[in-house]
Amino acid sequence: MEYTAGKYDVIVVGGGHAGCEAALASARLGCRTLLLTLSIDFVALMPCNPAIGGPGKSHLVREIDALGGEMGRNTDRAAIQVRMLNTGKGPAVRALRAQTDKRLYQEGMRRTVEGQPLLDLKQAMVEKIIVDGGSARGVVTRTGARFLAPAVIVTTGTYLRSRVLVGETSFESGPNGQFPAVGLAANLRENGFELGRFKTGTPPRIDRRTLDFSRMTPQHGDEDCPGFSFAAGNRGKEQIQVPCWLTYTTARTHEIIRENLDRSPLYTGIIQGTGPRYCPSIEDKVVRFADRERHQVFVEPEGLHTNEMYVQGMSTSLPEDVQLLLLRSLPGLEKVEIVRYGYAIEYDYVVPTQLAPTLETKAVSGLFLAGQINGTSGYEEAAAQGIVAGINAAQSVKNGEPLVVSRAQAYIGVLIDDLVTKGTREPYRIFTSRAEYRLALRQDNADLRLTERAHRIGLVSGAHYERFAQKKDRVRAELERLDRTVVPDPLGRVSRAEVQDWLAARGSAPLSRPCRLSELLRRPEIRYADLVGLGVADPDVAPDVAAEVENQIKYAGYIQKQAAQVARFEKLEARRIPADLDYSEVRGLSNEAAQKLAEIRPVSVGQAGRISGVSPADIAVLLVYLEKRRRREEESDGSRIGHLPSERSGELGSGTG
């Protein structure tokens, strides 16, 4: 029997990375919010790798932080090793990666959720979305509790009709032995949503006391590394850093896999879901890359106070006895004991082209989806969708302007645009290569790109916004100073001889004339820190300010070129397409284009052009049609204005009062 258990402004279903960001954003925007999760002990669970960040992913985390989200701050508190990746490459692809203590991460996020005003955390399994008149009205739990709200966000991760597979064994289960969400999957189908089926997996966890670290190569973190959060500044240098360890598969490893492929659900046809291309299982790697003699395997700590180690690169669904044989074939793991066995997990997802760029579903107003339910993989991708869904659900309740981030503004925009415009046939993972304007979308300038928008919405304020405003002012002031300061100094504080010697020491060409510091800094061999040695830079400039200044100066030409490309992109994005447009009336469109456009219903000409099957010729036809429609509407409006009744003619009313 159903009963009304509570009324809220926004309800979030699922307490993973997407759900936490969504619920926090909604509550921080003043909406009374309910977060329902299968187990409050598993809030912000990290069921797979104990790490945050990496190429593309660190950009998302910085953007979440710039919007006022929690993942960056929580990662900084829970980090046990931090490294900057791709330091030998340009700033567009440099990426921060943090090894985290899983328990610290979970506990920190749960404390934040429980301490957030206007946010209630409750344990329950949701089985039904209440839909009335095409709008979401709330949810119903397995026990019949009805929670009502005009906005619902579903962030169920990999739990929708999930099934775990190990060798020949399979059973209904979510990650880490949790319940699967079977009823909710059926309810989404009943509400007309198209669902697909994906697969992912996780490697075994092993006991560190059974490892021989002398046979592996240590991988240490960076000593002076920034944190993910702009608000918190640099990580505390007192935080403990622990090593990860590198080993490799062997010929024996590959032999064991090939001998047991007939016991792998991946190759026996038991697994039906599509797996992630960029995170394949070890058996898949050995088969697909048969010419490779070995594959890297990283042994990573799961926390400071546990003996569990994560074996990155060994995701598998092979039987348990085979998993042990595999691991014991690796150098350093000859006597290893497994604490938790690896497994594959199949789950349903909602085809994401059924969503608007706000992450609201097109079929049911007030219903938002975020995270792996939309076909993505990864904690960071989930959290990024979560904060956008949380903001937009709150804004819809408050009748505020929605937040739509374009692919020219953020990796979050790239992620969401790819999902809602192109869809995905495999678990979607973000990469820097997916962003056309990546030089403008660096991880170091996420705050300069997004924090002002978050401040206008009301998500960023106080010390966080003050720090951002100060950084912005300091960057501008330092850019202006470097542009007006000349060396050799006309006042003689830095002589010509000093400058030439300084340049020679750095292998840089001598000056033939006085030169602005900004020109000097454009030279690839000159760094901002070098200017301090010359006595022409402020040694107290914060590292984040110095990095931003250096990047803006060194890559000014490329950034300007990309800005011109962005301007063209935004021009097409500004050409809006009426929501009621009947594409069957647009003569000249190919049949495929008309079908795809009607199915996805893009909001702009720019988005239409990114739909698979829509050609440049189709876009040209669409532009002509939209222009003709605009002119007809203008003429119609003008005609109506010309026939408005006038007071002089007495047509506005002839009553005598």
UniProtKB/Swiss-Prot annotation:
Cofactor(s) needed for function: FAD
GO function terms (MF aspect): flavin adenine dinucleotide binding
Region (Disordered): 632-657
One GO term of the biological process aspect: tRNA methylation
Stretches with biased composition (Basic and acidic residues): 632-650
Pfam families: GIDA, GIDA_C_1st, SAM_GIDA_C
Disulfide cross-links: none
Amino-acid positions noted as binding FAD in the UniProt annotation, renumbered to this chain: G14, G15, G16, H17, A18, G19
Subcellular location: Cytoplasm
Domain of life: Bacteria
Function, as annotated: NAD-binding protein involved in the addition of a carboxymethylaminomethyl (cmnm) group at the wobble position (U34) of certain tRNAs, forming tRNA-cmnm(5)s(2)U34.
PANTHER family per UniProt: GLUCOSE INHIBITED DIVISION PROTEIN A (PTHR11806), PROTEIN MTO1 HOMOLOG, MITOCHONDRIAL (PTHR11806:SF0)
Official protein name in the record: tRNA uridine 5-carboxymethylaminomethyl modification enzyme MnmG
Gene that produces this protein: mnmG
